[in-house]
C-alpha cells in the first residue's frame, strides 16, 4: 500500500449539500477500492492563480489516503468525468506503508483531536463563567453606588 495526497478544486458556486454529496461519493470510491482515508481537509474558497472555466475562485479540498494505483486511477477517472471538478492533482507521499500502522495513527490523531476539543470546550466554559461572575460583580457595584447618597460638602 502507498500513501497519496490528492488536491482537487471544485466549482465555488456549488451549494453545500451538492458539495457534500460529491465529497461522500469520492470517499465511497476510496473505501470501495480498499483505501484508507487518513485526512480529509476542506480548505474552502480561494482565489485561483488563473481563471479555470471562467471562474476566478475555486473550492479547494485535500485528501490524504493510503491505497493502490488502481484506486488513484479510479479517483482520477471520476474527477475527469465530473464537470463540478475544475482541477485535480495526485502525488505519491510514501511508497510503502503498513495499513495497520496507518489505521493506528489515524485513531491516535482522532483521539488527540477529541481530547483537544474537550479541553478547549472546558476552557471556553470556564471563560464564560468567569465573565458572567465579573459582569454580576460589576452590576452589584453599580447598584451599591446608585443606592448611596452622594456626600455634600459642608461649609
UniProtKB/Swiss-Prot annotation:
Keyword Lyase: no
GO biological process, one term: translation
Chain intervals with Acidic residues compositional bias: 138-155
Gene3D superfamilies in the cross-refs: 3.30.70.60
One matching Pfam family: Ribosomal_S6
Keywords, alphabetical: Ribonucleoprotein, Ribosomal protein, RNA-binding, rRNA-binding
Entry GO terms, CC: cytosolic small ribosomal subunit
Keyword Repressor: no
InterPro entries referenced in this protein's UniProt entry, alphabetically: Ribosomal_bS6, Ribosomal_bS6_sf, Ribosomal_S6_plastid/chlpt, Transl_elong_EF1B/ribsomal_bS6
SUPFAM superfamilies: Ribosomal protein S6
Biased composition regions of type Basic and acidic residues, renumbered to the chain: 115-137
Record-stated family: Belongs to the bacterial ribosomal protein bS6 family.
The protein's role, per its UniProt record: Binds together with bS18 to 16S ribosomal RNA.
Protein name per UniProt: Small ribosomal subunit protein bS6
Amino acid at each position: 500500500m502507498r500513501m497519496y495526497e490528492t488536491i482537487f478544486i471544485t466549482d465555488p458556486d456549488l451549494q453545500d449539500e451538492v458539495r457534500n454529496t460529491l465529497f461522500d461519493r469520492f470517499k465511497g470510491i476510496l473505501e470501495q477500492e480498499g483505501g484508507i482515508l487518513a485526512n480529509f481537509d476542506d480548505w474552502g474558497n480561494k482565489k485561483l492563480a488563473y481563471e479555470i472555466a471562467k471562474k476566478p475562485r475555486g473550492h479547494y479540498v485535500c485528501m490524504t489516503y493510503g491505497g493502490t494505483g488502481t484506486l488513484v486511477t479510479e479517483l482520477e477517472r471520476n474527477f475527469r468525468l465530473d464537470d463540478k471538478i475544475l482541477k485535480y492533482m495526485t502525488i505519491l507521499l510514501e511508497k510503502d506503508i503498513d495499513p495497520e500502522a496507518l489505521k493506528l495513527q489515524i485513531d491516535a490523531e482522532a483521539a488527540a483531536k477529541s481530547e483537544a476539543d474537550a479541553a478547549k470546550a472546558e476552557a471556553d466554559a470556564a471563560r464564560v463563567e468567569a465573565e458572567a461572575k465579573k459582569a454580576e460583580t460589576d452590576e452589584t457595584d453599580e447598584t451599591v453606588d446608585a443606592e448611596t447618597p452622594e456626600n455634600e460638602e459642608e461649609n
